[in-house]
């Protein structure tokens, strides 16, 4: 893909956006290579599917790629991820991070890049340019079982959200404390420097 700025459907596509798209396409090609090797089913979803059919590529204002897999194939991908995705690729899940990840699906990221989404500024995880790999789970046909499943998912989601919120709040407080300490250290350093200059000029 050339990196020249252009306008599509009245929407300006910058060279920077195209460079992100190129990295994401590289990620997709690597993922498809692994899926083909292990006979795993995967397909485009959401805006990526619309863009592929309607726009023969990206939706002009889109900035991500959404792929989806069935649970069996997704679990097989997880099992081979450590062996298949070496640098510059990073296969990210809740199990690959020491800090809370905050997603129920995997993301394939590119080392040496940065893509910090709004609200993720304080997350201490890999934040490289990425593509999303969603998973489709089966739903029970029995309505009672379906309701119970929905309630369990909602409960887990609230617990995870609360843990994430607590971690973000704590991280913000720590960052504020560090900045405060650094400011005090700089102030103390400036005071010492001023005192040194003053007394060095005073005749004793």
Predicted ranges, named:
Residues 142-149:
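A short secondary-structure junction signal
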Residues 68-70:
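Short hydrophobic/aromatic beta-strand micro-patches
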Residues 150-157:
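A contiguous, mid-domain pocket- or channel-lining segment that forms the substrate-recognition surface
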Residues 32-65, 74:
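Active-site nucleotide-donor binding segment shared across nucleotidyl transfer reactions
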Residues 4-6, 12-38, 81-141, 158-204:
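Conserved catalytic core of two-metal-ion nucleotidyltransferases
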